[in-house]
Amino acid sequence: MSVLVIRASKRFAVRRPVTLHGPGKKRDGLMIELSSEGCRISNAERGLYAIDQEVTLQLDEAEHIPGRVRWAHDGFVGIKFARALRQTELGQLLQTSRAPEYSLAC
C-alpha cells in the first residue's frame, strides 16, 4: 500500500556536489533534490548524522546554507533549511545545480 505525501514546496531534481558541515564533521555528498524549504543529499556516510542536528550546507567557497537534519538513512540525508529560500535564490540555485559541469563531474 502506498502513502500519498503532500509537500508544502515543489521539489526539483538536481545534481550538485556539496559539503555538509556538522559539529566536528565535514563530509562531501551529492545534492539530488532541492526545494525552497530544504534538500536531499546522497552519498552521506551512514550513522554520521542525527535527526535535528544542526548542519551547514556548503555549495562553494562563498555560499553556505544553515539547516537541520530532518531524517537520515541508507546513505541519504534530508535537510530543512533554517529559512526558506526566496524565489530568486531558488531559481539561481536550480540553474547552477543543473549546470552541465556538475553532471559531468559526478
Predicted regions and their residues:
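Structured alpha-helical
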Residues: 1-106
